[in-house]
């Protein structure tokens, strides 16, 4: 079952400063749409900056899929206001367009023209576009327009170096990497609680269901939107944004060196399925970067990833190998449609508590049987999380308990951790967020997915989406900046375009040579 961590919490209560200095970062994706809800057909606006080199505003899969990236900070209000400033600036440059508030796009037919993101004529720009062409050919383009929130989280160095469980590690790098792998394994075990609480994609367009095996009996509304009565986050399902089963790749997060080796193997091992796509078309244009299981590191779609900031010319794996894990990236958050910026403060506070808890509790190594059971738990919550008396596997003997029972055990600890964090800042923010969110366990109608489904059934996805998109747009264009200002943002636009031109001028190798050297 779940370890009793009362002694560990008692230790933290005596040493609350161990949890002072948590750093976070947010990445928010959102589709640019026309006023009628259809996909924008325009390229990434020049007035926003270069998507290749802008520090804070870029594109993801397609030209109309915006991505906002905050710097890291230990101040939650700063992060949220910075993210709001980026939205306000963007809204001022796309006055005839809107930002779609849901993770799942509104698709009125299957002929939606999706323009893959373009990054210019430099080798790095061509590589980014070719990678996306590969994603289209491997998984389809519509599936890659599903948007989400990525939450980056790191615990203070002081915590890792003083944490009693880590005293036998050789050096700080090993100690921290091992600690984050413990956290990651526990996130796989218990992270299903995140889509239960905050999942916001209980419905999906019929076009996403083409050529997929339906494990569950979907219902359909008048807009041709398919839904399940108890679902939470279809974005995280095999219908949505997923590709490779990490079990097949033997990526188990048990040992740092084994993780690196397994990841490298996936990047080097050819895939029969992708060989059949072909590397180039009849005109000699690349159809994908290579025919390996993964083209690059970013293609491994998982609920949580170990990360490290990279230096110029360095890959993520090289950075991890050289300097260890620096932070974790949570990828299982849907866009929160009830927040103009896709995420709110309560969510961040709750995620902090839960990730600290994942770092504190015992984290045995995961074997394949364990991993299959954790996958079943995630699947149950994704498809039927709000089902009354929903059961969760608690060990590999197929023993189960109800979601409410396990959730209450988790929240008992989270409330204790909240007390410690609030003592550092002399307020009640964490305790308040914890108590409010705990109500979702016994009152599933309070969950984001239940609220979303209610709107989709009564008002419809198009009407609800456009109402929220217009409401948020007006809010953004009439809002004063918090941290940034118009001048700083305009200067970044100019700098980004200049930097893009510099990169293009400095290229020496042909694109083929560049790819070969990667």
Curated annotation (Swiss-Prot):
GO biological process: glutathione biosynthetic process
Record field: catalytic activity: L-cysteine + L-glutamate + ATP = gamma-L-glutamyl-L-cysteine + ADP + phosphate + H(+)
Entry keywords, A to Z: ATP-binding, Glutathione biosynthesis, Ligase, Nucleotide-binding
Coiled coil: none
Entry superkingdom: Bacteria
Cellular component GO terms held in the UniProt record: cytosol
Pfam families: Glu_cys_ligase
EC code: 6.3.2.2
UniProt pathway annotation: Sulfur metabolism; glutathione biosynthesis; glutathione from L-cysteine and L-glutamate: step 1/2
UniProt cross-references to InterPro entries, sorted A to Z: Gln_synth/guanido_kin_cat_dom (IPR014746), Glu_cys_ligase (IPR007370), Glut_cys_ligase (IPR006334)
MF annotations from Gene Ontology: ATP binding; glutamate-cysteine ligase activity; metal ion binding
Similarity comment: Belongs to the glutamate--cysteine ligase type 1 family. Type 1 subfamily.
UniProt cross-references to NCBIfam families, sorted A to Z: glu_cys_ligase
Protein name: Glutamate--cysteine ligase
Native organism: Buchnera aphidicola subsp. Acyrthosiphon pisum (strain APS) (Acyrthosiphon pisum symbiotic bacterium)
């Amino acid at each position: 079952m779940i370890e009793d961590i009362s002694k560990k919490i008692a230790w933290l209560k005596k040493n609350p400063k161990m949890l002072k200095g948590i750093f976070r970062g947010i990445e928010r994706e959102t589709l640019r749409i026309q006023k009628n809800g259809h996909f924008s057909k325009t390229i990434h606006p020049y007035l926003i900056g270069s998507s290749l080199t802008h520090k804070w505003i870029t594109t993801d899969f397609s030209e109309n899929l915006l991505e906002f990236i905050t710097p890291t900070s230990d101040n939650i209000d700063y992060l949220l206001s910075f993210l709001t400033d980026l939205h306000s600036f963007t809204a001022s440059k796309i006055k005839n367009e809107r930002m779609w508030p849901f993770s799942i796009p509104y698709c009125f037919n299957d002929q939606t023209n999706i323009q893959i993101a373009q990054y210019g004529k430099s080798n790095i720009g061509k590589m980014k576009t070719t990678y996306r062409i590969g994603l289209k050919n491997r998984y389809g383009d519509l599936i890659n327009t599903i948007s989400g929130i990525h939450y980056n989280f790191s615990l203070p160095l002081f915590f890792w170096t003083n944490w009693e469980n880590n005293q036998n590690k050789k050096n700080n790098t090993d100690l921290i990497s091992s600690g984050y792998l413990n956290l990651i394994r526990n996130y796989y075990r218990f992270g299903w609680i995140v889509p239960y609480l905050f999942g916001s994609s209980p419905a999906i367009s019929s076009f996403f269901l083409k050529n997929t095996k339906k494990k569950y009996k979907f219902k359909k509304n008048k807009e041709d939107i398919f839904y399940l009565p108890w679902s939470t986050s279809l974005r995280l399902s095999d219908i949505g944004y997923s590709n490779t089963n990490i079990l097949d790749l033997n990526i188990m997060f048990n040992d740092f060196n084994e993780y690196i080796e397994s990841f490298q193997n996936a990047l080097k091992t050819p895939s029969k399925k992708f060989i059949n796509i072909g590397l180039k078309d009849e005109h000699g244009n690349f159809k994908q970067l290579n025919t390996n299981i993964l083209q690059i590191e970013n293609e491994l779609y998982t609920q949580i990833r170990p990360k490290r900031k990279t230096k110029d010319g360095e890959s993520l794996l090289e950075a991890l190998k050289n300097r260890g894990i620096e932070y974790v990236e949570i990828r299982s958050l849907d866009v929160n449609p009830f927040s103009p910026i896709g995420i709110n403060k309560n969510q961040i506070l709750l995620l902090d508590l839960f990730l600290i808890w994942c770092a504190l509790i015992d984290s045995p190594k995961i074997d394949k049987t364990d991993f299959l059971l954790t996958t079943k738990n995630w699947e149950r919550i994704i498809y039927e999380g709000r089902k009354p008396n929903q059961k969760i596997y608690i060990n590999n003997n197929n023993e189960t308990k109800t979601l409410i029972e396990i959730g209450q055990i988790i929240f008992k600890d989270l409330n204790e951790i909240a007390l410690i964090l609030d003592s550092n800042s002399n307020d009640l923010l964490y305790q308040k967020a914890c108590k409010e969110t705990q109500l979702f366990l016994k009152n599933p109608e309070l969950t984001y997915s239940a609220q979303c489904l209610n709107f989709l059934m009564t008002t419809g996805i198009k009407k609800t989406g456009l109402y929220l998109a217009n409401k948020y747009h007006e809010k953004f264009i009439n809002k004063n900046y918090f941290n940034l200002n118009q001048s700083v943002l305009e200067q970044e636009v100019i700098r980004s375009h200049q930097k893009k031109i510099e990169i293009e001028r400095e290229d020496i190798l042909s694109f083929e040579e560049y790819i070969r050297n990667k």
